[in-house]
Amino acid sequence: MTKKIALLASGKGSNAKNISAFFKESENISVELICSNNSASPLFDFCKKNNISSHLIEGATKDDFEKLLLLFQKSKIDYIILCGFLLKIPYSIISTYKNKIINIHPSLLPKYGGKGMYGSRVHKAVILNNEKISGITIHFVNEEYDKGAVIFQKEHTLSFSET
């Protein structure tokens, strides 16, 4: 049976686009919905061109997230993937999708995780601290920023020329 996933992004959506492309021909996983809290995101055009449903998350209120939860349920979403999504997921969604919300984080957690640690902020901190190794972590989402169980980590050796 095909698992339906929703992708959430706040920026330009490069990870969301890549994940969508990767699963485009999959018989096991279908990208059903892409959501963003950024009305200027190029993801909305991407969704139109690729016949993927999209949703603008208009705010970060309880009502906004309740609407989002209802949309997930109506769309029969099995898993939610956070692809550079900057808003904290509320407990109502976390408890409904326990161990079914996955985050992609740009460091080897627990280093450089937590509130405010995302995107270029993480990379700058890694370079400032003269780290020799960095990488990514894929983990389940729980109530605390970047504290969910780790699913996968991939190390990357940094060169001295990286800035």
Where are the regions that the model predicts?
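One-carbon transfer enzymes
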Residues: M1-T163
